[in-house]
Design a protein with these regions (language model features):
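N-terminal "domain-start" segment that seeds a small globular fold
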Residues: 1-16
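Short active-site neighborhood of thiol/selenol oxidoreductases, capturing the structured segment around
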Residues: 18-28
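Non-catalytic, surface beta->alpha helical segment in thiol-disulfide oxidoreductase systems
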Residues: 82-107
Length: 107
């Protein structure tokens, strides 16, 4: 189960939710094994960075428009936005420390 600190983004709220601050978005799907393995890491990052960065998930099956716009071909993919601009792309299952280091570079 997702942490209550992890937001859920949709095609309709994505642009407004990523427009300000540092926002990490996990693109995932129910059927994706690596996505399920990444979920606890995403939950932990949401807790660790609470107040400094927003952490969110976006189901690619339920929301196809945004993943298409960013040419997401494989999941899990994490996109990091800073004030509405794409700052970093992380593809595949990565350790928490690597994702945290990416966040730290933009704080």
């Amino acid at each position: 189960m997702a942490s209550d600190k992890v937001k859920t983004f949709t095609d309709s709220n994505f642009d407004s939710e990523t427009s300000k601050g540092l926002v990490l978005v996990d693109f995932w799907a129910e059927w994706c094994g690596p996505c399920r393995r990444l979920a606890p890491t995403v939950d932990a990052l949401a807790s660790d960075y609470e107040g400094r960065a927003t952490v969110a998930k976006m189901n690619v099956d339920e929301n196809p428009d945004v993943p298409s716009r960013f040419a997401i071909r494989g999941i899990p993919t994490l996109l990091l936005f800073k004030d509405g601009q794409l700052a970093e792309t992380i593809v595949g299952l990565q350790p928490k420390e690597a994702i945290a280091a990416t966040l730290e570079r933009h704080l």
